Amino acid sequence: AIEEAYQAGQRIFAESRPQELAAKVKTLEARRVELGNPAYMADIEWHFIGHLQTNKLKMVLPYVSLIQSVDSVRLLEAIDNWGRANNKVLNVLLECFISSDETKQGFSEEEVQDIVSGEKKYANIHISGVMGMATYTDDETVVRSDFRKLKQISDMLQDWIGEGGNIDTDCREISMGMSGDYPIAIEEGSTMVRVGSMIFGAR
C-alpha cells in the first residue's frame, strides 16, 4: 500500500507505533537491496504521530523527519538528550490539549508558553509548530471550536518569534484534522492533516 501511494506521488508518511515504523523502514531497506537500487523510494519522509514512550526513542528518532506528538516536558527533554548524544537536531510539534476528552494528551497553552519562552533551552530540538486532536463527536461546532483553540496557540507562538526563546520563523506548522474531520481543520487553518485511515483503511 505504501508503494502504491508513493507511485501516486505521496512522499510523506506517518506511523503511530514505534515497532511498526522501524519494521517499515527495514522492509524498505531490504527492498532496495533486493532491487539493487539504493535510490528506490529513498526520498520518503517519515513522521511519527502516536504516543511516544521515552524507552522507545531509538526505534523512532533515527528514522523520522518530524515527531508530531511531543506531549510532555519529560519527552521533550528525552528527545533533546538523544539529539545531543547523536549530534542531531530533531524537528517536533508540541501536542496541545484542545478537546473536551480528558483521556487525550497534550500541553496547555500556559505550558506551551513556558516551553517557548526559552527559560530552559533545548539546543537539539527545533519546534516546528503545534499538533492537536479535536473532541470525537459529530457536533461540528465543538470540533471547529477545538481547532480554533489550536490556531490561537499557533498565533501566540508567532508573537514569540525573535524574542530569544525556543522558536524561530519556521514554527508555523499546524497539524490538525484526521480522516473524519479534516475538511473543518483545513477551513480553520491546518497546514497538515493526518488521513491514513481514509487512504489505507482502518487498522
What are these regions (language model features)?
Residues 191-192:
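Divalent-metal-activated hydrolytic enzyme cores
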